[in-house]
């Protein structure tokens, strides 16, 4: 579908965890929430494109919390990994040191908000 969540057929829209928007499949709750808000406005005669901010995914494991924000697969960059006995922090940065993704485990998950603020949006 396009960013208005329109299929190629007039008046048919798509919403849910299996929707591909402009080539991106984001099968998680937060993208659905953003899409539902945009689609509601569109169906109310106010055409609104869906925009996705950076949306890290929380992997719910009680023994070891994990938060991941994967970089675009076509992006060039390097992972920088720091680890200690209670945590792992992996940052994916481009050649100019712009943060494009991360993985946090254990105590490093406390850095989620600060790191997410530095990420680019998934779709503008």
Where are these regions (language model features)?
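A short, polar/charged loop-to-alpha-helix boundary motif
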Residues: 108-122
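Mid-to-C-terminal Rossmann-like scaffold of FAD/NAD(P)H-dependent oxidoreductases
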Residues: 18-111
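A Rossmann-like FAD-binding core segment of flavoenzymes
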Residues: 1-3, 95
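Short, intrinsically disordered/low-complexity patches at protein termini
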Residues: 32, 123-124
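Short FAD-binding loop at a beta-strand-to-alpha-helix junction that anchors the flavin cofactor
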Residues: 3-26
